[in-house]
């Protein structure tokens, strides 16, 4: 039994860390497509092709259920994958769903009409590709009415985090928050719509101010996955061991990942 976790780089490790803590008995196979990162500047067809290739690799590892722990892939590829590509005995889940459930306080299976929610002004921080897809706004509109979403494409942040340049990453986050607040001075909530961003959560919160509720994905996804597997245990796949795979240089990626999570992580070539 194993569950696959995919990201274009290292950001998905924030999700992996949370799901491992929540489900310690489940083996997880992590696949980082570091050779092609970042996805946030690629076009939708490119993202679709790369995401399908990574998903197939995780299926080959015995993971019948794959989590796209990458907002760009979830936004630009998942809908198309679910409509035309995923076989009936497999499942691929994105990371938007738990966020929208938390924001709208309604479950995913709730198909009642959209309704008013408490939060009216939402700031979305994400990669340029995620912002361009408008996937978050589309999914939110199915569930809530009267919510104003202001999206800020956060160019450069993922690269700075992947390169371990914390000072640059912090400066970029502050600059992106300032840019958004010029358009939406008083957001009630902020969505960190990239799995790299939880590492910068304190900086986002500080720049936004204490009155803004910041939604970060890792723990929300972990709770959602635990709930899903309780309802659908047949999708815990045949794999039996946890491992870390990368399309990049395993040694370099292992070193960065170890810095990233502050515990030893060893990647092998995918």
Swiss-Prot record:
<feature type="binding site">
    <location>
        <begin position="39"/>
        <end position="40"/>
    </location>
    <ligand>
        <name>substrate</name>
    </ligand>
</feature>
<keyword id="KW-0133">Cell shape</keyword>
<dbReference type="InterPro" id="IPR015942">
    <property type="entry name" value="Asp/Glu/hydantoin_racemase"/>
</dbReference>
<comment type="similarity">
    <text>Belongs to the aspartate/glutamate racemases family.</text>
</comment>
<dbReference type="GO" id="GO:0008881">
    <property type="term" value="F:glutamate racemase activity"/>
</dbReference>
<keyword id="KW-0961">Cell wall biogenesis/degradation</keyword>
<feature type="binding site">
    <location>
        <begin position="71"/>
        <end position="72"/>
    </location>
    <ligand>
        <name>substrate</name>
    </ligand>
</feature>
<dbReference type="InterPro" id="IPR018187">
    <property type="entry name" value="Asp/Glu_racemase_AS_1"/>
</dbReference>
<feature type="active site" description="Proton donor/acceptor">
    <location>
        <position position="194"/>
    </location>
</feature>
<dbReference type="GO" id="GO:0071555">
    <property type="term" value="P:cell wall organization"/>
</dbReference>
<dbReference type="InterPro" id="IPR004391">
    <property type="entry name" value="Glu_race"/>
</dbReference>
<dbReference type="InterPro" id="IPR001920">
    <property type="entry name" value="Asp/Glu_race"/>
</dbReference>
<comment type="pathway">
    <text>Cell wall biogenesis; peptidoglycan biosynthesis.</text>
</comment>
<dbReference type="GO" id="GO:0008360">
    <property type="term" value="P:regulation of cell shape"/>
</dbReference>
<protein>
    <recommendedName>
        <fullName>Glutamate racemase</fullName>
        <ecNumber>5.1.1.3</ecNumber>
    </recommendedName>
</protein>
<keyword id="KW-0573">Peptidoglycan synthesis</keyword>
<feature type="binding site">
    <location>
        <begin position="195"/>
        <end position="196"/>
    </location>
    <ligand>
        <name>substrate</name>
    </ligand>
</feature>
<feature type="binding site">
    <location>
        <begin position="7"/>
        <end position="8"/>
    </location>
    <ligand>
        <name>substrate</name>
    </ligand>
</feature>
<comment type="function">
    <text>Provides the (R)-glutamate required for cell wall biosynthesis.</text>
</comment>
<keyword id="KW-0413">Isomerase</keyword>
<dbReference type="GO" id="GO:0009252">
    <property type="term" value="P:peptidoglycan biosynthetic process"/>
</dbReference>
<feature type="active site" description="Proton donor/acceptor">
    <location>
        <position position="70"/>
    </location>
</feature>
<dbReference type="Pfam" id="PF01177">
    <property type="entry name" value="Asp_Glu_race"/>
</dbReference>
